[in-house]
A protein has these predicted regions:
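Catalytic alpha/beta core domains of metabolic enzymes, predominantly
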Residues: 118-178
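Active-site beta->alpha loop and helix N-cap motifs at the rims of alpha/beta catalytic domains
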Residues: 1-106, 110-112, 120-124
């Protein structure tokens, strides 16, 4: 039976100069149900000790209340807490709402912000507008992670760079399309 902590330690040993990152679903950790605060704190501490450096923390409903304990735990472990906006579209999911969310996460002590376009819904100009607004309103590095579901991922990345994004996520094509 595989031990994920052992695998993580081996990765860290083999990549000593690479910051390892994980996606953390806030109060849901790695799944789809809420866990108690003590379980969240213990999991984050264990992940940090075993080699995770950057925790990309999000809530699928963009409810920042579900991020607080994870952010506190990451900071207590001395690691990088990346607050994450789960991008989607609706009448209430506006640039202004996402900026408000980013400011709330900044007040919680995050180190950077990620725009997580998990469904590939971002369009190039929406990307530029959102990145520009975040850079103007929040004094933190902005990362973008997009999926190419609608074939616009690379253009969104370009527009993010042009609008001032600090980092973009990329993938090796032989792995990304497989």
């Amino acid at each position: 039976k595989e031990d994920p902590w052992e695998r993580l330690r081996k990765l860290k040993a083999g990549l000593p100069n690479t910051r390892l990152q994980m996606l953390l679903r806030g109060q849901n950790l790695l799944g789809y149900r809420h866990y108690s605060d003590d379980v969240v704190r213990a999991f984050v501490a264990k992940a940090a000790v075993n080699g995770i450096d950057v925790f990309r923390i999000f809530d699928a409903m963009n409810d920042v209340r579900n991020l607080r304990v994870s952010i506190e735990a990451v900071k207590a472990a001395g690691k990088h807490a990346q607050g994450t906006i789960a991008y989607t579209t609706s009448p209430v999911h506006t640039v202004e709402a996402f900026v408000k969310q980013a400011k709330a996460m900044q007040a919680m002590g995050i180190d950077s912000i990620a725009i997580k376009d998990m469904a590939g819904l971002l369009t190039p100009y929406a990307t530029a507008d959102l990145v520009r607004a975040l850079k103007a309103e929040v004094d933190l590095p902005v990362f973008i992670h997009s999926h190419d579901t609608a074939g616009m991922g690379s253009m969104c990345q370009l527009k993010a760079i042009e609008a001032g994004a600090d980092h973009i996520d990329t993938a090796i094509s032989s792995f990304a399309w497989g």
